[in-house]
Amino acid sequence: MLGRIFVCRQIMSLRSYSTVVPSTGTKPKVIHLRPSVDPVEVEHFSQLVNEWMDENGSLKALHSFNRIRVPWILDELKKQKSSVNDDAVPLQGLRILDVGCGSGILSFPLIRLGAQVDGLDVVQGCVDAGTSIADRILPEKLRSSARFVCSSVEQFAAEQENIEAYDAIVASEVIEHVPNPNLFIRSCHRLLKPRSAIFFSTINRTFLSQVVAVELAEGLNLTPKGTHDWNKFVTPHELRSLLLDNNFQVAYDRGLFYDPLVNEWAWFVVNQVNYALLARKP
């Protein structure tokens, strides 16, 4: 199919997370939907749609993060590939799912490296923006490599065509916004091909992360107010346990450090605030 594909799999309003169906009893049955999605988070990120691609705006740290996370993803996927492609498009032939893609901050660099990238997000405005941006900034020959889908990860994983369809999944700065991490990870396992990688970056739940990633970050306008809830942060031990419980093999985790004075990221020996983790489906 030529050009990008825009798919919206929303089956309800983003503000509604349950539906009522007839029941044989005296009371209607309520079926809860999208248990990995928090409507408060959806509302918050819906307000940021126009800021996603501003490299000097409130989300600039995500843009600068590409300078370290893209090489990390690239290096690991080159190890995973059985053949070596042209250096200009080293990810050619790989299909990647970017979960919680926003408007494509990470998706587009991966596309330019040759990957077919499906960006998944529950915010309709982000999907619309990503689709529009793809048409505007990607060369015509790359537009068919970009697809933005409006869906939760568990809804997406419920579709037969998506099962074991991906060579890699990236969940960068996402799991700290998910109310049901176990369901999220189980759904990702269903989507990945065997012997494929899943990449996480997130925030540890420590006293230091409360001070640095919430109070200072929001107080200094490094992140939009209300972006992070410390209680949702996931420790490396918890993330490892969730992955092992869902039949992943954990390779390693590494600390990350962000310097807001120069808007730069670096790998760090300490993981008390930000960290990255690599796991694989056997």
Where are these regions (language model features)?
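N-terminal, positively charged/glycine-rich alpha-helical extensions of SAM-dependent methyltransferases
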Residues: 18-59, 63, 67
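Conserved alpha-helix/loop element of class I SAM-dependent methyltransferases that forms part
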Residues: 64-92
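Conserved SAM-binding loop
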Residues: 85-89, 94-208, 277-281
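Core SAM-dependent methyltransferase catalytic element
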Residues: 264-282
